[in-house]
């Protein structure tokens, strides 16, 4: 049983889709803090693509992500609870918004090919990105 737990890879939980694309379903402040702590020793710049549901404490999550990245972009995805551009209005002065998350991810991957692109903020969003980008490998 112990070995089974050690070898259990949960989809979209600290999962590298490629050498430069990491998806994680961290979707609340405590989970984001743990994710940030796991990434503090990464020896390359990190670019964050963030999307979450409207009921989440976005401010605490963005502050924590700022500890590991100077490049955080906000986006949305197709779900009735997902934050859209209007829901991010308090943060649009500090963060760029992409209506299409594919554009946000592809822009980061293409402009920073040697860096790490982190997708997080919602387990649903992370799983969506995982399923789409894993098939492109």
Please give the residue ranges for each predicted region.
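C-terminal helical cap/extension that packs against the catalytic core
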Residues: 60-116
């Amino acid at each position: 049983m112990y070995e089974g737990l050690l070898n259990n890879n949960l989809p979209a939980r600290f999962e590298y889709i490629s050498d430069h694309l990491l998806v994680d379903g961290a979707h609340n402040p405590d989970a984001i803090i743990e994710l940030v702590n796991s990434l503090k020793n990464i020896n390359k710049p990190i670019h964050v693509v963030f999307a979450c549901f409207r009921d989440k404490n976005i401010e605490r999550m963005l502050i924590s992500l700022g500890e590991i990245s100077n490049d955080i972009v906000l986006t949305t995805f197709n779900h009735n609870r997902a934050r859209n551009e209007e829901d991010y209005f308090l943060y649009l002065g500090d963060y760029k918004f992409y209506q299409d998350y594919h554009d946000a991810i592809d822009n980061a991957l293409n402009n920073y090919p040697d860096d790490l692109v982190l997708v997080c903020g919602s387990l649903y969003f992370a799983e969506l990105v995982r399923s789409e980008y894993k098939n492109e490998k």
